[in-house]
Amino acid sequence: MKSYFMQPLRGTKDILPNEINYWHHIHDKALTILSLHNYSEIRTPIIESTSLFKRSIGETSDIINKEMYTFTDQGDRSITLRPEATASIARAFISNKLYHSNIQRLWYLGPMFRYERPQSGRQRQFHQLGIECIGSINPMADTEVIHLANQLLKELQVKNYILEINSIGTLEERQSYKLDLVEYLSQYQQDLDQDSKNRMYSNPLRILDSKNLKTQEILDGAPKLKKYLNKRSTEHFYLVCTYLNNLNITYKINYKLVRGLDYYNQTAFEIKTNSKNSQNTICGGGRYDTLIEQLGGPKTPAVGWAIGIERLLKIIEDKLILPKQKINVYIATQGLAAQKKIWEIIQALEKKNIKFELDLSNTSFHKQIKKAGKLGAKFCIILGDQEIMDNCVTIKRLDEYVQYTAQYSNFLQEIHKLQH
C-alpha cells in the first residue's frame, strides 16, 4: 500500500540540492540588477489576517472565492497563507510607517499559496519574485519597473517573450465602462461561456480575457475601455509608452488586458512567452494607487510586478549552464588518533575559506579516495595511524595522480596551496 503521507502534498514540490543552484542564480541576478537601481529586499510573514486579502484583492475575485488557504487559529483569528505579496507589502508599508521616508523601492522573493488545480507551471505552493515602487505617480515609475523586468529576463536568457500593456484607467472610469459592457454583453448572455456568465454581474472586466473563442468573437463588438479614459489617464499611458520607446523595449497594446486583482488602476501589463502552454504569462503587474489608502494608510501611489519562479525555471533550466559545485579538498581518516587530530586541519581549511568535505564512512582509504574522485575534489588529505606516528600528512593530488607527504607543521603553514 502506497504511503501517501510520505509524499509531498498535491501541488507542492521539494526543491532538491541539484535544483537549488538555479534558484540561487535567479536570486543573485535579481539582487545585482535591482540593487543597481537602489531597490532593497523586504521579507514579510507568509501568514496574514484574512481581512487583509479580502479588502485588497477583492471579494469577487477567484482568489478570494476559491483559492485561499484560510484557517482559524487557537486565538479564534481568521488567518490566510498569503496568495500574493503586494497586499502584505502594502500592510508592512503602513504598519512600519515607511511613508515617512521618500519613495520606497522594494523587492521580494518567497512562497505564495493558492488552492488551484495543479498543472504544468501552476502549483499550490509557488514562488514569486516581485518589486514594488511605492510613492510616485510619475509614469517614469511605471517605465522603470517594466524596464527592470525586461532587464532581468534578458540577464536570465529568456528568449521570445512579448510585453503586453494596457491602461485600465481609474476606478470611476472603469465603473462607467462596466455599466456599458454589461449592457452590451447581456444581449448575448446565452452565448457566453459559463465562467463569463458567472462574472457578468460580479466581475465583468475579467470577461475581457476569456479564453473562450465564442466569447472573444462577441467581445469584438463590445465597447472599448480606452474610450472611457479621461485626459489624465490617456496622457499617463501615452508617456509610459513613449518612455518604453525611448528604451527600445518592444511592446504590444492589448486593449483587452485586465489584471485579476481589484486593486489595479491605470497601467496594467503582462509578459508572455511564445509557449502554447496556457501558463505562458511569466510576469504580471501594474499600478495600484488606491490600495494603501484603502488599507488605512495615507494616499500613496505605487506600481509593481511579480514573476512566477516555477514558470520561469521551466523556460530557462535547459538553457542555463551553471558551474558545478565542486570541492577542493576531501578529508580521509582512519583510527581514533587521526580522527582527534583532524579537527585542527579542518579549522585551518575554514580560516582559508577552502571548500572541503570530511569523510564520515569509516571505510578503507581506497574507498574514501574513490569517493573523493567522484566528488571532483582536487586534493585528498589522508590522515591515518602511520601519519600520526610520523607526525605528517599525506596529500594526494587527484587530477594529476600525484601523492606526497608533508610534515604536519609545514603542511599547516602551506595549507593555502590547496585552494589551487
Swiss-Prot record:
One of its GO terms (molecular function) is ATP binding. This is Histidine--tRNA ligase, chloroplastic. It catalyses: tRNA(His) + L-histidine + ATP = L-histidyl-tRNA(His) + AMP + diphosphate + H(+). Its main location: plastid. It holds the Pfam family tRNA-synt_His. SUPFAM superfamilies: Class II aaRS ABD-related, Class II aaRS and biotin synthetases. GO terms for cellular component: chloroplast. Signal peptide: none annotated. Keywords: Aminoacyl-tRNA synthetase, ATP-binding, Chloroplast, Ligase, Nucleotide-binding, Plastid, Protein biosynthesis. It is an enzyme of class 6 (ligase). NCBIfam families: hisS. Belongs to the class-II aminoacyl-tRNA synthetase family. Gene3D superfamilies: Anticodon-binding domain (3.40.50.800), Bira Bifunctional Protein, Domain 2 (3.30.930.10). It comes from the Eukaryota. It is found in: Plastid, Chloroplast. The lineage of its organism: Eukaryota, Rhodophyta, Florideophyceae, Rhodymeniophycidae, Gracilariales. GO terms for biological process: histidyl-tRNA aminoacylation. Disulfide bonds: none annotated.
